[in-house]
Every structure is written in C-alpha cells, then in structure tokens.
C-alpha cells in the first residue's frame, strides 16, 4: 500500500515557544491534521464514522525531530498509509519546509466502540483508505 496525502500549513505564533520554534507537542496535531484530511480527501467523513458509534484512536505514535520549524514557516505534512490489517492502520509522516526534513514519525491507529472495546476496522473506514 502506498497511498500518500500532503497538507500544507503555516506555523502560527501561538504554536511557538519563547525561542520562536514550533513547540514539540504541535507535531502530533500536525500529524492529526494530515491524517483526517487524507480521509476527507478520499471521500470519508469522521463525523459520519463516529455517528455510527465507532472511533479511531491512536494506539502508538512516535515523532523524531530533525530541525526546528519556526513561526510563519510553510510546512508540508505528508501522511502515508503503510499497512492496514483487520485491527489496525499503520501510517508514517514526514514534515518538510521546502526540501528540508523537519520531523518524521509513525502512528498505529485502532478502532474502538463507545465502551473502548477494540473493533475490527469496518469497510466505511477501510474502503476510502484502500481504494485507487
């Protein structure tokens, strides 16, 4: 599987620490923005998915920081679906400023019901992520 999606965003002032660097916690938010935009771009709707009583949760996430991003930098966040199994979705991320790698990471996602019980990944989530 090699489905990839890219989102552009600008580092906002409120995301920066006193040194003017994007605070490290924001990268998880950047990953989530790319992840949800990928699903939307493929015709999916998290709102509709959650209305069915199922939720996508992050089971594991990692981020490696290569270079600092600064206030007003224009970043590209690429998310790639690496693998989908019956119970999890594995994704990888790269954050770029022009051609400079700023950060990279991986996440493992799972689906749970309202009680937090692990569920198989349903077609409503799988189909947009596996389609052509």
Give the role of each language-model region.
Residues 2-58, 114-132:
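Hot-dog-fold acyl-thioester-processing enzymes
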Residues 3-7, 40, 70-74, 82-132:
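HotDog/MaoC-like acyl-thioester-processing domains
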Residues 8-12, 64, 108:
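Generic structural detector for well-ordered beta-strands
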Residues 43-45, 57-66, 80-87:
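Short glycine/proline-centered loop/turn elements that form peptide/ligand docking sites
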Residues 52, 59, 75, 89:
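Exposed loop/turn and edge beta-strand positions of beta-sandwich/beta-sheet ligand-binding modules
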